[in-house]
Amino acid sequence: MRLSVIGCGYLGAVHAASMAELGHDVVGVDIDTHKVDLLSDGRAPFFEPELEELLARNVDAGRLTFSENFSAIEGAQVHFISVGTPQSESGAADMSYVNVAVDSMLPHLRRCTAGPEVVAGKSTVPVGTASRLAQTIERVGALLVWNPEFLREGFAVQDTLRPDRMVYGLPDDPGTAARAKEVMDAVYERILATGTPRLVMDYATAELVKISANAFLATKISFINAMSQVCDAAGANVTALAEAIGMDERIGSRFLRAGIGFGGGCLPKDIRAFQARADELGVGDAPAFLAEVDRVNETMRAGVVQTAKELLGDNLTGATVTVLGAAFKPDSDDMRNSPALDLATELSGPAKRVVVHDPAAGPILAKQEDRPYEVAPSTQSALEGTDLIIVGTEWREYQDLNPTQAAGLARTRYVIDGRNCLDAQDWKAAGWTYRGIGRR
């Protein structure tokens, strides 16, 4: 099938490459010339495992092209909307990119002769968006499906090609819904053939699936982080606690690792947008607990700063602090709402020096001007002469650090394990004063 993908950022680039890998003829459209040039050359504009190989293979095979012009979508049967919905000043989702994408594609629809033409929304949007857009799209004879994404950065290619479920939000009219479903089933034929569950529902429910999933994950993370504060006060171990409660099949163990909080371009934004939309619908009290989820998340950074002051002295005067990690999670170079960088920025005021290292995000960070911290080219150089190590992102290379070798580089042996990913006993045995999140 001929497909188009509107917006070639993180979501769109991965989706375009993955659909081409399934054998479709795909064109990606983006207004960013530099991004289009990179993608057209088979290069990824950001770090994501497996993506660059996928891009190069399908660009070389001629199945995947990129353009700045919306006219390039003409003739495609399915058009995926994959643009961002960033947080506005009010906390609500900024829908301007989605609206512009739809307005820009409208003149180029109804050029497909292969069958019904479908616009498939993948962007995370406030509930009610699809119904509004459907009125516009159906006026030109196309159909709208809401097909939310469930990608994890660092596993995005895997999650696209081998998803744990497929969701279609379809029109109310049974005949229209049947035609749209048939087209989407053809797009995902190879994925569905593996047994991936396909869930069919109305527009509003499909929109809520994505936003409520993110709200639930954020709640689970903040729950275990709140428990870590209780563990600190009571002398308990949050890692052992999480293991025990995670064995309850009603709870499960995933997302129960205490740390310095969640970040990225999804969870913080989405829980605030969810609250804002609920307020607009007159049910703001229903998800009001998400404000507390947000608050707990923010307080985790403050707790690390306080621990740093307890270890090095209240004013941190003369101290060098090393923050290991800049991306909000490992296997990514995404620094949006990064807890590690929040810490680096906050500590840059009182500390003499703050040095940051990240194996993927570091080179990008080094090019940024007016940052209050240094960026080290290697883990070793980041540790030289440090007084305190803070693990802010659980990259494998940080987990594999030899504490004895690290001690030979540091000036004093203090470590705050902001992701509870180090072997505490090994670090203590090497002479380090170790502090974890909810464990010692």
Where are these regions (language model features)?
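Structural/interface elements that position substrates and couple domains in central-metabolism enzymes
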Residues: 1-440
